[in-house]
């Protein structure tokens, strides 16, 4: 049974106590839109992981502070393929596709867009500048199922406490690397103690 708007109406009075709200498209869209609106009205940052990918209204996009997508979701949202067949040959890896895809999404009203690039790292396109952070190298891939969730959890935790975007992205990448080196989905999510 899916959550309904009626079940989250209490948030209108509570949301100002939050540092950040994380949404994803597995939640019914009308619930996401209402929570995002509450957060926006109370100046609470909203992180959206728009998977599974659905059409997002312009109004909803303007409530989002950080939109985090992987290469496939970026392509679904923009039509721009971010090539990932370089196999550690950095001379063949070009950030332009990720930069353009993130700019297209920013043009729809989201101020900050992150595109996770798997073993290549992550880009972050903000109103001020473009960031790129390489992934942690030489990690044995055991199970990648929770890598995105690990990255998003670490990003959200650290963006509320650290001023340095570089440090936030490094910690999020490291957390995702710990996750892919461990079997299971929930079991692979590291604790904050393991990340330190």
Where are these regions (language model features)?
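Structural motif
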Residues: 19-20, 112
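Short internal alpha-helix immediately C-terminal to a glycine-rich phosphate-binding loop
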Residues: 7-13
């Amino acid at each position: 049974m899916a959550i309904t708007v009626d079940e989250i109406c209490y948030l209108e009075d509570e949301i100002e106590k939050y540092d950040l709200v994380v949404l994803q498209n597995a939640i019914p869209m009308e619930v996401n839109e209402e929570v995002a609106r509450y957060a926006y009205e109370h100046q609470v940052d909203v992180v959206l992981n728009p998977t599974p990918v659905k059409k997002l209204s312009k109004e909803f996009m303007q409530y989002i502070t950080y939109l985090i997508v992987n290469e496939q979701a970026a392509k679904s949202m923009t039509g721009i393929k971010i090539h990932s067949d370089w196999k550690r040959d950095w001379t063949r890896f070009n950030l332009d596709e990720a930069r353009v895809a993130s700019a297209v999404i920013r043009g729809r009203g989201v101020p900050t867009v992150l595109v996770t690039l798997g073993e290549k790292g992550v880009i972050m396109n903000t109103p001020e500048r473009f960031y790129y952070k390489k992934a942690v190298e030489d990690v044995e891939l055991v199970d990648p199922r929770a890598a995105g969730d690990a990255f998003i959890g670490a990003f959200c935790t650290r963006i509320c406490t650290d001023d340095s975007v570089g440090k936030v992205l490094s910690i999020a990448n490291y957390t995702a690397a710990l996750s892919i080196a461990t079997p299971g989905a929930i079991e692979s999510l590291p604790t904050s103690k393991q990340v330190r």
